[in-house]
Amino acid sequence: KTGSGKNKSAYSYLESIPEEKAMIQKLYEIFTATRSIKKTADKMNELGYRTKVGSKFNTSTTRLLLKNPVYCTADESAYNYFLEHNGGLCGDISDFDGQHGISAYNKTDQEKFEDVDSTFISPKFVQLMSQKPLSEWIISVGRHEGFISSRQWIDTQNMLDDIAEKYNRPHRKTNALLAGLVYCP
């Protein structure tokens, strides 16, 4: 619903904006070619694209856009992907008709707490947001158009998982007593 205050006056739905659709398709195209979040962000900036708020692309915003299922077309492949990853699916496979996009809910945890330099007169708050595991998401078919084929979106998720696995390896452990403390001249 839209409107202000407690009484909402009308319902609104996601609508396709041609420039945004082209930008998202370009983002996925560049990532598929480069297989690099940083190179994708740099190329998007080089081509003159900006985020919704007018900022330059960075690795964080690029990763968020690539992981967002709202751009994925809701079809049988998407349904099976979320089923395999224990996503909370609403509706059955017949709802995933290949005509609409996916809507995902309950994707983030948000915490708000008082900052250390907050005062009674001038309160300051810090808000932390972290992404929940896919198994806690609620997945449904939206009324909006999907911008990216489910195959391309799933391939992108697999590439992102490979990148995360590559860079999230535990550091080497050594039993040497002075390892990291003593250096050769």
Language-model segments: which ranges?
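Conserved catalytic breakage-reunion loop centered on the nucleophilic residue
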Residues: 1-185
